[in-house]
Amino acid sequence: APEGGWDMIIYNLGATKALNFGDFNRINFEYLRNFTEALERNKLMPQKFLYMSSLSALGEADEKNYTPIDSTTVPHPNTRYGLSKIKSEMYLETHPEIHWIIFRPTGVYGPHEKDYLMMIECIDRHFDFGVGYRKQLLTFIYVDDLVGAMFDALASDKTLHRKYIISEPRAYTQTEFRAIVAKALGRKAVVPIKLPLWAAYVASYVAEKWSHISLKPSTLNRDKFKIMRQRNWNCSVAEAEADFGFHADYPLKRGIEETVKAYLAEKAAAKAQK
């Protein structure tokens, strides 16, 4: 808008790993509060404000019957990251003058995303590491589908002051994920290695302590362990489908093919530079 408030703002700033809760709180909550207060103070509040939260804000789900996470799930975040996200959500809920929409995406993947890249690299080396022995249901959303959902939600007149889970509307097992990635990489032999929970916890604890010494946040930490330990990430996107016609154009197979294509191109470019 040339004068007054913005038409729309997508607030995607956030930290997914940090040295401590203080950093998570500062980046994920305080920055949001400061930003919205500045908008209000300068009379620049947008007509719609889309906040990118996370499925982790809801915490652990039903791991007995594997009931999908949905809009009725009561949040009880079990990670520092999830706690900082639900705190931000609660802040928005208590400020109706902010015309908020909240997205709770599941694991976002795509070219150049770092966490899933580590899993792809392992499978490229013929190994697939998993945590725990009980069945685990995983959900994913390809980055292009998430971006499309943002603009569809902003264009809808039904989304104001609503929260939406964003995911491809089906879950996968670790075995299915491994098979899809291996096929995209052209790897016929991949050895699955299951780490017991205690071993994964020890590795996460050591990596986190080292990050405190090096002052560099580690991808592997106790927060990440709790996420890896969680067995049920299955979720419902019924509200998003009903309110703004959400659909995923990239099922995991297609999204992984695009992600692997970018990974192999970067790998070839790095090899050519040596």
Segments the model singles out, each with a brief description of its role:
Residues 83, 87, 113-118, 132-155, ...:
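Substrate-positioning beta->alpha
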Residues 76-104:
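Active-site Tyr-X1-5-Lys
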Residues 156-219, 253, 257-258, 267-274:
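Mid/C-terminal beta-alpha module of Rossmann-like enzyme folds, strongest
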